[in-house]
């Protein structure tokens, strides 16, 4: 007897419907075809144990299993459930009439319990596109899958519940989530706020400019000056995620298996802060079965690299291409996968190996050569992709002792959103450009060209401060954002002057002059 059930294979962000065909005829052999990996081939043992534990026997006949399309590699244990159901139906132990109406995924434990799988959300999207009546998933995956409208999603605890449901012996209600309500309720629930930060007004301003224009930023300052504290509060002033951005971001986390059983849509921009010992594969993605790395988990959010020079130089260099292209391709011998990685890069670092170069309250023991060597751990091409370079001074006692709260994140966020709306209107007809940080050279000349007085000041600053040539475009991009925050149609002298102040590391004499001179 021939029976079909349906599942899905996830490769990168792409999902393909998999048809599982089971044929049982007299005999004793078990045959598997369909390019499955080791976990798929081992499913026979898991299924046999799960069935026996629940009163069924694995078919003792000539059994042929095929997973189509045969040229598509199938990976993981998510095919256990649909294969087990097809085996039972083909062996005439259950009525399999309804199998064709549902897509199924789930790993079977030896006792028949359903274990969570990766990629339930993109699988649900595929099931809806293929016009299945519903999707059956492990209970732990039901909330993330249920965000897909116009699809019945059933979360099951074990294989016996699935059998009862498919055969019509027991009624189950599909999981229902008010996606929009949950999304908007959680959108502004931030635990951290800039009102908690004492002093550091110049750094807050730099972070506001970075948020308004989508600019990458690096903070340089001694230990304890508040670099990490400031960075962790940046999501609270960023424009909120749109539903489309949230769905895309949640899919990536679903594929990576990073969603909890209580998760539905991710409602706030991701903030990822990998340790400096992270490997290249963990940062950009990879592995035997390529999975998203930290840069993709930070998609539509922030990637924060604390103590940047402590990262492996080779690991840092692999960031250059994703920062430019906003997508990462991971290639293997017979296939490749692609993950989006449109993130805002925020970094922090000490000014020298001992950490106290230029600190008025501590003595630095580093030589200029040691400082320069420390700074050279960050390559020019990587630094070229960071628009704002902000120095942080230790907070004076008079600021620490203040009892009045600082400006709240909500107030700053209003200004950021207003500036972003100006940019969205400006670039509405340009594909792939949404904020000032993404402007091309041609667009810089079109939208950020300074007036005559500003050009002269910029020329003078580049000569006097030994600014590098690559700083020119970055200054104009940042100046355009500052003008947007001011509601100014033209880039004017004050905007250029402030933007010049954000290019500290481009100064040729950085290691020789004092940091705060």
Model-based region annotation:
Residues 1-218, 222-228, 331, 471-472, ...:
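Peripheral, non-AAA+ core regions of ATP-driven protein-machinery
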Residues 26, 58-61, 98-99, 131, ...:
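Short loop/turn elements that form and flank the Walker-type P-loop nucleotide-binding site
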Residues 33-44, 59, 66-76, 290, ...:
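Basic, amphipathic alpha-helical bundle interface domains used for macromolecular binding and assembly
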Residues 170-209, 213, 240-295:
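P-loop NTPase nucleotide-binding/switch module
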Residues 219-260, 325:
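Walker A/P-loop
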Residues 300, 306-307, 318:
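Walker B catalytic acidic pair
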């Amino acid at each position: 007897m021939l029976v079909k059930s349906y599942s899905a294979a996830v490769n990168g962000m792409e999902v393909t419907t998999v048809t599982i065909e089971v044929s049982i005829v007299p005999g004793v052999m078990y045959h598997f075809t369909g390019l499955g990996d080791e976990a798929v081939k081992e499913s026979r043992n898991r299924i046999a144990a799960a069935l026996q534990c629940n009163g069924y026997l694995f078919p003792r006949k000539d059994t042929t299993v095929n997973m189509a399309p045969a040229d598509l590699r199938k990976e993981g244990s998510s095919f256990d459930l649909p294969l087990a159901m097809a085996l039972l139906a083909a062996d005439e132990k259950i009525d399999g009439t309804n199998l064709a109406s549902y897509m199924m995924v789930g790993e079977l434990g030896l006792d028949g319990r359903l274990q969570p799988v990766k990629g339930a959300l993109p699988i649900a999207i595929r099931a809806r596109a293929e016009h299945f009546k519903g999707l059956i998933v492990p209970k732990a995956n039901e909330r993330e899958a249920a965000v897909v409208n116009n699809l019945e999603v059933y979360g099951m605890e074990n294989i016996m519940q699935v059998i009862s449901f498919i055969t019509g012996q027991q009624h189950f209600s599909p999981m229902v989530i008010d996606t929009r309500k949950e999304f908007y309720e959680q959108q502004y629930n931030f635990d951290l706020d800039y009102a908690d930060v004492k002093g550091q007004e110049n750094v807050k301003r730099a972070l506001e400019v970075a948020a308004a224009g989508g600019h990458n930023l690096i903070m340089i300052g001694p230990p304890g000056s508040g670099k990490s504290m400031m960075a962790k509060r940046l999501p609270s002033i960023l424009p909120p995620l749109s539903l489309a951005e949230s769905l895309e971001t949640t899919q990536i986390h679903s594929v990576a298996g990073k969603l909890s059983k209580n998760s539905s849509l991710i409602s706030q921009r991701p903030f990822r802060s990998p340790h400096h010992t992270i490997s290249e594969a963990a940062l950009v993605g990879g592995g035997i079965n390529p999975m998203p790395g930290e840069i993709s988990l930070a998609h539509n959010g922030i990637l924060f690299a604390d103590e940047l020079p402590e990262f492996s130089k080779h690991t840092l260099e692999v960031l250059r291409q994703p920062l430019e292209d906003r997508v990462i391709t991971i290639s293997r011998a017979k296939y490749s996968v692609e993950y989006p990685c449109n993130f805002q890069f925020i970094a922090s670092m000490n000014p020298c190996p001992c950490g106290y170069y230029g600190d008025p309250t501590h003595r630095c023991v580093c030589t200029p050569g040691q400082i320069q060597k420390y700074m050279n751990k960050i390559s020019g091409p990587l630094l070229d992709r960071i628009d704002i370079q902000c120095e942080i001074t230790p907070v004076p006692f008079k600021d620490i002792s203040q009892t009045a709260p600082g400006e709240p994140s909500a107030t700053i966020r209003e200004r950021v959103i207003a500036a972003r709306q100006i940019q969205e209107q400006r670039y509405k007809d340009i594909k792939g450009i949404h904020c000032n940080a993404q402007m091309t050279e041609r667009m810089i000349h079109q939208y950020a060209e300074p007036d005559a007085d500003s050009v002269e000041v910029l020329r003078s600053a580049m000569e006097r401060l030994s600014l590098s040539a690559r700083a020119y475009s970055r200054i104009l991009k940042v100046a355009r954002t500052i003008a947007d925050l001011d509601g100014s149609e033209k880039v004017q002298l004050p905007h250029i002057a402030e933007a010049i102040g954000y290019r500290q590391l481009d100064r040729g004499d950085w290691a020789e002059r004092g940091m705060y001179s």
